[in-house]
């Protein structure tokens, strides 16, 4: 008999406000431990330098983390002008220093270049892989490998301010956009070089900024629970967002209770649906009058709802540490 995983069967999403100086995986493991969750996964790593929104999916919520990886993001970034580094941020070594000499008109023209759909060549200091190895491993050995440009979209690029040699921007962009690369490219266009000294992710998909919580706040709640001699879950679980918020933009298809068992066994079922739904379009599946979320699926060519990823409903508690 397979050993059950340690931790609680707890499902949901924590909007972590990651602090600077820590890896996203370190932050993930701390959240998992605080919630005593059997399973956890984040939805797109932030560099150690970066702070801000890092949605952490717990339990069955991890099945939908890819859809947050694919979501739009928003960042507040401050760049130091006049210096270019090998990593395009302040964690790297300065490789070139140049005078800052551009006009306001030149800056605005350069910023406009990055708006809309463009192509971006990823930094060598990224987790993208080449022949099975992350690019940053090659970079640390002084090896540069070919990288193909990738399409990105910058929906908004707002000028916030320029104080001395520090430029601050607000950027709303598509998945896979490297803010460090935008800043490095901008610095080259301005002829002075630039690198990131502050990066904060302020939004992922439509998640509210105000719902973010820090590791310090989580730790304080655990300590408070111990003082009150109550289970930490009493104070922590209200912070969780429902896991279906990861696919909130998907159209809903509601399955009547009578045929729900067939769907939950993986069978395609016929249900009344919106005529506007396209074949193979991803949908959010709910059950019965209470509209309980159970996963995602697609409408196949026969007009049947085919489950693609369903949650597991646990009846027994998992083992604890």
UniProtKB/Swiss-Prot annotation:
Its EC number is 5.4.99.25. Keywords: Isomerase, tRNA processing. It comes from the Bacteria. GO terms for molecular function: RNA binding; tRNA pseudouridine(55) synthase activity. The active site is at residue 47. It is an enzyme of class 5 (isomerase). It catalyses: uridine(55) in tRNA = pseudouridine(55) in tRNA. The keyword tRNA processing applies. Pfam families: TruB-C_2 (PF09157), TruB_C_2 (PF16198), TruB_N (PF01509). CDD domains: PseudoU_synth_EcTruB, PUA_TruB_bacterial. Belongs to the pseudouridine synthase TruB family. Type 1 subfamily. Responsible for synthesis of pseudouridine from uracil-55 in the psi GC loop of transfer RNAs. This is tRNA pseudouridine synthase B. The gene is truB.
